[in-house]
Amino acid sequence: MAIKTKRMLSKTKSCSCSMPGVWRAAAYCSGAAVIFHSPRACAHVARSMDISAQYRALANGAAENLKPIPVVSSMLQEKHSIFGGADCLRACIEDVVNTYRPKCLIIANSCVAGVIGDDVEAVGKESEVKYGIPVLTVPCYGFLDGEYYQGYFAVAEQLAERFFHKQTKLENTALLIGDNGGPWGHYAKEVKRLLAYFSIKVIGQFPGYIPINELPQITAASFSIILGGRGQTYNGLTKIARLLEMNYEVPYLQDGYPVGWDNTVDWLRNLGVFLHQEDLAEKAVVQEKDKLFAFADKVKKITQGKRCVVCIGRMLMYFHPAGILETLRRLEMQVEAIILFDNYNTKERKLMVEAVSAQCQAPIIDQTAGQQLLETVDLVLTTHEITNNQDIKQIFLPMLPLVGTSGEIEFMDCIYKTLCRRGEKGGIVYV
């Protein structure tokens, strides 16, 4: 019997709605308001995102007074598909301006608005003149001709163009570019901790987390750091970083994604070269290494010699196995096999096999052959939840892995605690 998993999807291009991306790019920019030119149901998506983001933020230690900006639907109905929804949008804009007194309006377009053919840009320009505030519109319509990140990056670029100005630089300051859970998320907190070795202070995170009236000041940063990963997200954030560099003289730290110890070392040394402080970078590497290996030595009494398998079902552009296998070697665990799920096409499977083979000598087997092996090992690390065996101990490998030394320690701690669980009871742990 083959291994059964949840949500086995494999695609190279995102297929999603652009409207949540529009909202997320301004979610905590106090002074702004977002209008969804959409039926009421579409606004429920943003509301659900808002609730989930609030719970994640509180879990990560954010202040409880965290407040997202207003999101209002223009309440398109069936009749507007015949007569158009422009008047409905105008009425919504007037209501939002009178109710919330925003300093900036951002309009997200739904599929319905795109099918109708409403000229949202014209309504935006008209409203900007009427109310005397910036009104930003985006060139994408729900699922029709864009996706989440197209809306996200469109708003980011327009906020930069409308509000940024050249400023006198503040020494030893940095601007974070991207989201990854916001200022209270693991990525941002870890980057701030590592920057402390160089006495660098973060003055903001763009887009989404800087009040509208403070946007002109953030170009005073000495440089910017991209909170990116791989693929289209990183490419889009890099475009924003280049815009800041070309137009506002804010250079950015290039080529760095501190996932895994080796990449964290590269990131620190790259930062040292960028800042012309190579000596500080080497001191940081030594201190971080001592911290990491001290923790590894502490937990190896449990992890040493334990048998595990790694199950992979993501494409190489989204998931690189090197960091995971590096951690398992550090903990002196025995990798019995690498199981590749059946959702790969021939090209993607070949790329993943090459990446795994370069890091590990364990056999690479398919989904059918791996089922029996799962029942004999101490631990399964997997990119997809395995559903047809409740007795195995699983650790779910996230799409966005934890970064830096703290991320490595947290991952090792998760492995340690999972192996320490008593009895034969299985289950899944999310890092």
PLM regions and their residue ranges:
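An N-terminal assembly and electron-transfer interface module characteristic of large anaerobic redox
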Residues: 1-431
